[in-house]
Structures are given as structure tokens and as C-alpha cells.
């Protein structure tokens, strides 16, 4: 029997995600059980990389290195946007505390040609703060933080999703290290000396001296 356009699209998305998983040390996924040879309609996507979160009782913004998003490809997909639900703590202007994800213009004007692997690329860029919008936030506190903070360099993870293709995937030894899931993003210590020479910024180190009137710079 000839497959419907939707089934063909679901099958194409599944193959694209399998290929993406081969090309990325960041992404993995699980699928809901399917009947017979039907392609998956529901995914639990796991991203392993640096993102940010903040506990409700704390003012500290923390690093988190594992993120899970559920993606449900409803009956109207790909004509309509998939249902997205964030399942792990995250601190981002465009993701609400309850896990609702804002994709900007895609939320009101969904593009059926946007494939599932491309959507995962967008989600990864949100996690690492390469992509965020502070003007129409779902999390106002995160938007205010993103606009005013100067302590954290963004994006917090420089790797593209297809990091194996880009040649920046971690080595086996690095990958074996336990993930850092809650490291306080504290303000860095005040730099010793910062010289500005034209457009070039040069860091210098202050070396202690027994004479308080003398400051050595290396």
C-alpha cells in the first residue's frame, strides 16, 4: 500500500535523527513504542552540553549539562508545529518554568519544510544561549538576567550540534568524565590589570610585592 505523505515525512525525520546522532556527541534520543513498521511519532531528545538553570530558592545561575525535551509529532504534523515539552530544569528567556517552548515566528507561522533534525539544531542553540529573544520572553527573570549580566560569556557551549563533523567532539577520555550538573556561575574575580591599546585588549598579571608602594606587572 502506498504510504501517505505524513508517514513518509515521519520516516524521513526518523532517518535524519539517526544520522544526526551519528554526527553528534551531544544528541541522543529515545522513541515511544510503535506498531508494526510505523515510524515514531514521539521522541525524548537528550542534549549533553552546557546550558543554564536556576533553582527557585536561589539567585545563582548554574551550569547544567544534560537536557531532555519531549517532541510529539501530532496528527496534523508536518502541517502544524510539533508539541514541545521541556522536562529538565532550564533558565532561558524563551522557555517557561513549566516547560513551554517559544520558537518565535515558527509558533505562529510554522514552516512544514522544517525537518526534525533542523528543529533539534534550533533547540540546541537555545540551550547554549546562542539563540534567545529578550523582547517577548516566556521567562521574564531569565530575560532580565540575559540583558543585564556581564559575568557569563555567551554562548555557554561553543560546539555546533554536529560536533563530530566539525571535529570538536570530546575525546573518549573527556567523554568519560562525570558531567558537571550544578556549578555556580559566579562572577569572575576582578582582573588584575587590563590595558587597552587602541583596539587591542591585553591582560596583565599583578605580582605581589613586599613593598606596598610598588606594583609589579608581568
What kind of region is each of these model predictions?
Residues 1-65, 76-218:
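UBC/E2-like fold recognition across ubiquitin and ubiquitin-like conjugation systems
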Amino acid at each position: 500500500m502506498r504510504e501517505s505523505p505524513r508517514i513518509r515525512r515521519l520516516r524521513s525525520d526518523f532517518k535524519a535523527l539517526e544520522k544526526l546522532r551519528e554526527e553528534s556527541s551531544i544528541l541522543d534520543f529515545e522513541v515511544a513504542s510503535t506498531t508494526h513498521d510505523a515510524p515514531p511519532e514521539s521522541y525524548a531528545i537528550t542534549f549533553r552540553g552546557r546550558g543554564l538553570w536556576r533553582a527557585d530558592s536561589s539567585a545563582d545561575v548554574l551550569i547544567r549539562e544534560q537536557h531532555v525535551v519531549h517532541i510529539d509529532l501530532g496528527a496534523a504534523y508536518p502541517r502544524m508545529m510539533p508539541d514541545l515539552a521541556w522536562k529538565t530544569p532550564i533558565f532561558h528567556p524563551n522557555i517557561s518554568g513549566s516547560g513551554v517552548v517559544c520558537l518565535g515566528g515558527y509558533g505562529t507561522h510554522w514552516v512544514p519544510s522544517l525537518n526534525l533534525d533542523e528543529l533539534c539544531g534550533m533547540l540546541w542553540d537555545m540551550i547554549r544561549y546562542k539563540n534567545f529573544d529578550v523582547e517577548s520572553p516566556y521567562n521574564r527573570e531569565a530575560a532580565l538576567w540575559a540583558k543585564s549580566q556581564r559575568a557569563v560569556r555567551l554562548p555557554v557551549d561553543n560546539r555546533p550540534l554536529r560536533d563530530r563533523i566539525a571535529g570538536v567532539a570530546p575525546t573518549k577520555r573527556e567523554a568519560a568524565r562525570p558531567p558537571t550538573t550544578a556549578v555556580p556561575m559566579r562572577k569572575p574575580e576582578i582582573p588584575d590589570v587590563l590595558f587597552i591599546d587602541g583596539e587591542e585588549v591585553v591582560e596583565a598579571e599583578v605580582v605581589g610585592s613586599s613593598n606596598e608602594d610598588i606594583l609589579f606587572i608581568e
